[in-house]
Amino acid sequence: MAFSPFGHPYGSTSQFLVSASSSATCCETAPRPVSDVASASTSASTLCCTPYDSRLLGSARPELGAALGIYGAPYAAAQSYPGYLTYGPEPPTLCGALNPQYEFKDAAGSFAPSLTQPGAYYPYETTLGQYQYDRYGGVELSSAGRRKNATRESTSALKAWLHEHRKNPYPTKGEKIMLAIITKMTLTQVSTWFANARRRLKKENKMTWAPKNKGGEERKADSGEDSLGCLNGDTKDATASQEARGLRLSDLEDLEEEEEEEEAEEEAAVSAARRLADFQKSTQPLPAPCAAAQERCLESRECGLGLPRFSFTEAPQSGEADFITAEPGGPTMILHYPSGHKPRIWSLAHTAAASAVESAPSTPPRAQSPECHMIPRQPSSIRRLLVPRDSEGEEDSPAAKAFGNSTFTLQGLPLNCAPYPRRREPEVRFQYPSGAEG
């Protein structure tokens, strides 16, 4: 016989429940069996229930009794075991509760409050009882399974090791593993503790040890005091003082090295900044007056340049008066404009003459570059050096046509230099042919 809606087949005999008496059976007829509820069959079937022993239901397996109490509801009251569903004398009550036409949410309120939460696992067999079927059954949720915090007792071994190795507080991998086993800590906790301890030790040394600017005499005095303390104290105190002195000196050496490195870096930065400033100064353009003075007067640092002075004088009637006598003792520069080809020498005097020609009321002629000849003049005699004129067939220059027989005189530029004595001002004269007509 089987109850298909529950999915648990049960025969006439069970391996868990044994009938107390084979003759005591309870069979009732039902107009509609459970298997034919959906098909609405009219054939009748018989539901037979066998009474079970009370010691098998209540004492041996209470879980099985709670699970199977649904099927033995008519006999649960006799065995002092409550049932989840109360059955009447007629089995159609059970069939009506399982009818698909019946709304299940209304019937759920009758047996849902009586359901209890099952345990983490069900040890159906003693050999399988030690295995945890639930994934949280074997996990210990207490603090014993978590990482242990570092306490004062657990860090005592770490402190002892650090005190023994103060000069080199860096444990190896094997020492870390050994300390982790002793203190029951992880390797990460041990490494973190040693890192924090080294930082605290360095901070304490900076605060309590001698400053890094101490001189040699003060160090000698400190070493003498330390030696006296070692002689007066016991052996343990002497060893501790020697270690402290060694640590202090080693730290002072390290600080001196760091100070030297910092000073070297500062000096390098200052020198780089200085070179950059010099480079910027050298790249700055010179002012216009200083640049002009540097170009025009290379022999002196302080130069004064006067303005040119122009004078137009009429030529005398005599033939020898084509030139104006310059001051005795000074050089004379005579400029002659040829009419043939373009001159090869450019000078400041020609530039001034060209500007004067352009400012004349007549048509401005094309500027021609003069050929300059320096004539030294002595007080007793006057020597003239002239450039021969071109052939007579050539036409006169435009400057000669413009000025005729006149002479254009340009007084020299006064050039005064501080380190040298002042020279006489030279006189620059321009000569134009007198035969040309305007």
Swiss-Prot record:
Keywords: DNA-binding, Homeobox, Nucleus. This is Iroquois-class homeodomain protein IRX-6. The keyword Chloroplast does not apply. Expressed in a subset of retinal ganglion cells and bipolar cells; including in type 2 and type 3a bipolar cells. It is found in: Nucleus. Pfam families: Homeobox_KN. GO terms for molecular function: DNA binding; DNA-binding transcription activator activity, RNA polymerase II-specific; DNA-binding transcription repressor activity, RNA polymerase II-specific. InterPro entries: HD, Homeobox_CS, Homeodomain-like_sf, Iroquois_homeo, KN_HD. Transcription factor. Binds to the iroquois binding site (IBS) motif of target genes to regulate gene expression; functions as a transcriptional activator or repressor. Modulates expression of RCVRN, VSX1, BHLHE22/BHLHB5 and TACR3/Nk3r. Required downstream of retinal bipolar cell specification for the terminal differentiation of type 2, type 3a and possibly type 6 bipolar cells. The lineage of its organism: Eukaryota, Metazoa, Chordata, Craniata, Vertebrata. Residues 205-270, 388-438 are annotated as: Disordered. GO terms for biological process: detection of visible light; negative regulation of DNA-templated transcription; positive regulation of DNA-templated transcription; retina layer formation; retinal bipolar neuron differentiation. Belongs to the TALE/IRO homeobox family. Residues 214-223 have a biased composition (Basic and acidic residues). Transmembrane segments: none annotated. The gene is Irx6. Residues 143-205 bind DNA.
